[in-house]
Amino acid sequence: MLFRSAEAAGVDAIVAEGFEAGGHNGREETTTLCLIPAVRAVTSLPLIAAGGIATGEAILAMRALGAEGVQVGTRFALTEESSASEVFKEYCLHLKEGDTRLLLKKLSPVRLARGNFQQAVAAAEAVGATEEDLRILLSKGRAKRGIFEGDLEEGELEIGQASALLNEKGIQTVAEVMDELVTGYHRACETLAANVCERWDV
């Protein structure tokens, strides 16, 4: 694992990101749920979980798996303060489960939302596109066009699977998101303490 090299180099903490995350990703398709305990088992460094984390409940789950903290991307990418296009934000807030896919594994794996570009990449890969073919497909500033200019037709729409959890949220401020995450985390802690542990006689 790459984290071993990072640990040897003297880093202060490790960020372990599951393939639920938006944007560039690992080729292994390891979920955050499986990745965090695997990394926790072999390092004593502070561990920051990432990928698919958009609620307070998810934060508690990561803590239970051994992470000291979390990295949240999709939630904050869709806030008022984000520099992403408003068109991109609104589009992502209407995505459903299964609307994002991990593609471009021959180059640099990236999770993309449904749209013309995602379809074009999937079609190219299905017929055996070479690395050079894929580079040509990517060579038109696609990410900037999609995320920052709001080009939903030809742009690269990078966002995580957690977007499907945000359909009823609308565009929120960072403060509102933080309040929800903290409140949700504490509520989940209380629920776990009051119900699960007692029910399972732990």
Model-identified regions with their sequence ranges:
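Short, small-residue-biased leader/transition segments that mark boundaries at the very start
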Residues: 1-2
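Non-cysteine beta-strand/loop elements that form the S-adenosyl-L-methionine
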Residues: 12-18
